Amino acid sequence: MQAKGLWSADEIAALSYGHYTTQLPKQGLPDPSREWTLMAAVIQIESVEDTKVIKKVVAMGTGTKCIGQAKLRKTGDVLQDSHAEIIAKRSFQRYLLHQLSLAVSDTKDCLFIPGTEKGKWMLRPEISFVFFTSHTPCGDASIIPVISHEDELGHPLPSEVTEKDHSSNNVCESVNTTYKRKVRSEEDIGFISKKMKHSIDEILTRPENYEEENRHDFPSTCQKALDVHRTGAKCVAGELQDSYSPGVNYHTVGVLRIKPGRGDRTMSMSCSDKMARWNVLGCQGALLMHFLQQPIYLSAVVVGKCPFSQDAMERALYNRCHKVLSLPCAFRLNRVQIIQSDLEFQHGRHALTKKDATRKLVPCGAAVSWSAVPHHPLDVTANGYRQGTTRKAIGSPQCRSRICKAEIFNTFRELVQRLSEKQRSESLSSQGLKTYWDYKAAAITYQEAWNCLRQQAFTSWIQTPRDFLMFS
């Protein structure tokens, strides 16, 4: 159930900013004299009357960093992606696991009610979730034009172009704004990507199984665009690549991207790509689908005051997936509501730069996770481990983030072990379930939905190698 019209984007932003200020520790937050960060949150909306809702933050994350391939571990004890959106989503999964634990204990005041399938639960109909992010997600959603200072920081832009990565700078040049949309032939009908033209007369080189579907021009309001926000994020191999032409032709839009690393390339897909995946598979992940009859979709995404384009957000978060067919029962393309707030995040780079344009700012190296759980709601990490971890201590349980794969898996297994055979879903009754990957693979409908999405829309998605998922 969506409580449309009973909350505003500014209310969601104000609630998130207030929670950030009052509930997160100073440890892990940026020093505003020299550092900036990004913040994301999940807000639970409960409809109590036709004209009233209760709003509360149930998960929050801050962060700007990812670790490179060389630092990945096969034990699942390091956080691979510490961008704010991903920290918030993993914190939300921790909250959902706690709520499922309450449901299993027959606690009335929890999110879930018994489903119609054995061992499965459903979200109460009066509950929905809104995702707040202080900034446009890195990747395709951030591919927007630089027009003017006022438009850049204040109002939605109707254009179709570029990503401003979490640590990139802006460069302004001038050019035209026409681009082509390409799609694969019938074999990969849902795979959509778009390529900026070098000029009107130039024909792009492409594989034989690509064909031009249509061409779009930017609205006349965007003809004054000087450039696009540049990014260090690279297009995934197998996708159309960036042309690096001057100005607005610099980037390819609609393609999968990898988050940048400092020297050591990451394996983390952009936040735009991951959020698009959530709009088909849900935010709960594979493990929690063993308990849930339906995926948990976001009802809305609210973006703080920042460079923003409605068209780019819609393209990135669900239009790229609009031709995905034959999803298993309960899965669908979630056309999430997307709105922008006029309230700016106090510790964002734009807000801090406006106060003093001469100071040199760097992204904060720490990430903070907060979940609405009774025990140890906070988690502060750096470089994928608890803040303060030494090289010698890496590998010990004390150094793990509470939202790393290994810890989420431990919490999940503790919940499974509390269930009798009669209480377990069919998928949990499978024989030989031992490793993290075993349990993920056993969530059959989730894996079927993921296969549909990957085969029809995200064919070049980079997956974590299997040997990094075999821990128990």
Swiss-Prot record:
SMART domains for the chain: ADEAMc
Positions contributing to 1D-myo-inositol hexakisphosphate binding: 90, 274, 277, 405, 440
The active site lies at 85 (proton donor)
Co-factor remark: Binds 1 myo-inositol hexakisphosphate (IP6) per subunit.
| A to I editase domain location | 59-471
Per UniProt, Zn(2+) binds at 83, 138, 271
Q: Which PROSITE patterns does the record match to this protein?
A: A_DEAMIN_EDITASE (PS50141)
Q: Which cofactor does it need?
A: 1D-myo-inositol hexakisphosphate
| Reaction(s) catalysed by this chain's protein | adenosine(37) in tRNA(Ala) + H2O + H(+) = inosine(37) in tRNA(Ala) + NH4(+)
> What broad class of enzyme is this?
hydrolase
Organism domain of life: Eukaryota
- Cysteine-cysteine disulfides: none
Q: Which GO terms describe its biological process?
A: tRNA processing
What does the record give as EC number? Answer: 3.5.4.34
Recorded GO molecular functions are: metal ion binding; RNA binding; tRNA-specific adenosine deaminase activity; tRNA-specific adenosine-37 deaminase activity
- Tell me the keywords, alphabetical order: Hydrolase, Metal-binding, tRNA processing, Zinc
Q: Which family does it belong to?
A: Belongs to the ADAT1 family.
Q: What is the stated purpose of this protein?
A: Specifically deaminates adenosine-37 to inosine in tRNA-Ala.
Name of the protein = tRNA-specific adenosine deaminase 1
* Taxonomic path: Eukaryota, Metazoa, Chordata, Craniata, Vertebrata
